[in-house]
Amino acid sequence: MSGLYTETREVLRKYGVRLRRSLGQNYLIDEVKRQRILEYADLREDDRVLEIGPGIGTLTLPMAELAGHVTAIESDPLIAAILMDRLQVDNVDVIVGDALRVDFPEFNKVVSNLPYQISSPITFRLLEHDFELAVLMYQKEFARRMVAEPGTREYSRLSVMVHFLAEVEIVDYLKPGCFFPRPRVESAVVTLKPTGFRAPAFLEDVCRALFQHRKKKTSKSLRESFHEIRTDLSFNEVLRGLPPEILEKRVFQLRPEDILEIAEHIEDLSGSS
């Protein structure tokens, strides 16, 4: 067994902790993978790092030695108390709370083994902020949807939104045995670099409407889910002026730029009505 596995078990035993999968408490125990994650993050003395779901400090402790400051947000008060007890440095702040609700401090990098049940909302919340780089662990299937291309089975609303908001790359995969306790799924390490793209007001609504019927033609999908688009325009008003080559495609065949064109079309009409 690895030293990190032994260390993790000893810490949990010392504090009498029983981990809960429902909270995404699967801790990294593979030393090689941990080192790779730190290398991808390329931490330096002037970096201010945000970590979500630090657990007992598997990443927090080595990051504190490399970065200028680390802020760790932990939702479980017991685990947060253990982390604070283990910290022997003064450049780490631990916030006890829900990462979807608490105010984020200033940061330029994010490094996290994310609780997988909040993967989507926390990713979009992070992308509302300006930062240099994120190195994040996700469930493998979620990561593949993030980078999926049009026409593939994994292509989704997530794929389209992330396409515009960040440069995304899957840089590593992790088997269940890399964690304790073992999750039921494989995982992936993903790097994100925000593009600074400002999405038009209707892009998210259009994506949501279209991908409710991803195998149908775009015109039919829009008709059936038009109520998802928060506009005073009618379906027929929107339909007019959209290129036939877009309307005839099935939703899963649409390029992100096609969907952006629909959203911008609605925005233009809304501004002129």
From Swiss-Prot:
Example GO molecular function term?
RNA binding
Q: Which family does it belong to?
A: Belongs to the class I-like SAM-binding methyltransferase superfamily. rRNA adenine N(6)-methyltransferase family. RsmA subfamily.
Q: A single Pfam family, by name?
A: RrnaAD
Please name the PROSITE patterns in this protein's record.
RRNA_A_DIMETH, SAM_RNA_A_N6_MT
Broadest EC class assigned to this enzyme: transferase
* Stored SMART domains: rADc
Q: What does this protein do?
A: Specifically dimethylates two adjacent adenosines in the loop of a conserved hairpin near the 3'-end of 16S rRNA in the 30S particle. May play a critical role in biogenesis of 30S subunits.
Any one GO CC term of this protein is:
cytoplasm
Q: Methyltransferase among the record's keywords?
A: yes
Which UniProt keywords are listed?
Answer: Cytoplasm, Methyltransferase, RNA-binding, rRNA processing, S-adenosyl-L-methionine, Transferase
The record's subcellular location field reads:
Cytoplasm
List, alphabetically, the CDD domains matched: AdoMet_MTases (cd02440)
Please tell me whether the keyword S-adenosyl-L-methionine is annotated for this protein.
Answer: yes
| Organism listed in the record | Methanothermobacter thermautotrophicus (strain ATCC 29096 / DSM 1053 / JCM 10044 / NBRC 100330 / Delta H) (Methanobacterium thermoautotrophicum)
What is the protein name for this chain?
Answer: Probable ribosomal RNA small subunit methyltransferase A
Positions of S-adenosyl-L-methionine binding: N26, L28, G53, E74, D98, N113
EC number(s) per entry: 2.1.1.-
